[in-house]
Design a protein with these regions (language model features):
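Alpha-helical interface subdomain recognition
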Residues: 1-131
Length: 131
């Protein structure tokens, strides 16, 4: 969650630096989803600390975290494209654009490793819903 918060802070800083407001609603939505993920992680940790099994929550967390990571990195790319700034542009000497591209491409695989999101959804359907 901490890494996702750092990505969100970088996106927010970039959006402010270019005066970008068109994607503010999407940014706010991601912020709420990140807070929700944080609370869910804490709830699961409390369950484990009490000696209980997390059950379906581990599958739910995997889906929430990977989809959120993908959406955060996608927003990072969208606002950079919106500003017309290329990955290795002189406007971004710290290579933040290149890092955004690496993060974006890297998160695509997160929905596969650890069990694809589709498999995780099937696990939840079978265990929680009895389907």
């Amino acid at each position: 969650v901490a890494g996702k918060r750092m990505q969100m802070a970088a996106i927010e800083q970039f959006m402010e630096s270019i005066g970008e407001q068109d994607h503010q609603t999407q940014f706010n939505d991601l912020s709420v989803r990140l807070d929700t993920l944080d609370v869910t992680v804490l709830r699961v940790l409390a369950t484990v600390a009490n000696g209980e099994s997390p059950g379906n929550e581990s599958s739910i967390l995997k889906i929430m975290a990977t989809e959120l990571a993908q959406d955060i990195t996608e927003l990072g790319m969208v606002v950079r494209q919106y500003a017309g700034i290329a990955s290795f542009s002189a406007e971004m000497p710290d290579r933040a654009g290149a890092k955004a591209m690496v993060d974006y491409l890297g998160t695509r695989s997160q929905s596969i490793y650890g069990g694809s999101n589709e498999i995780q959804k099937n696990i939840i359907a079978k265990r929680a819903l009895g389907l």
